[in-house]
Amino acid sequence: MGREILVDARGLEPPEPFEKVMDAVSDMGPGDMVLMLLEREPHPLYRVLDRNGYEHHTTFRDDGVLEIRIRLKHA
């Protein structure tokens, strides 16, 4: 079981959420997962993740926060 890396990007203005999550995913190892918290859906981020070998799953919480779980595709 790997690490869970939390990126709380709530309240941050672009491009800071993107920069923070890209720093976190670049530090991931096999089995690690990044959990990103955000108030808006980051469509540009999804495209970058897809192109670079990551899978992502987004859950919409009742409080308006999105939980985005990011893993390496081969992990």
Protein language model regions, located:
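Positively charged, polar, low-complexity stretches
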Residues: 2-7, 11-15, 19, 23, ...
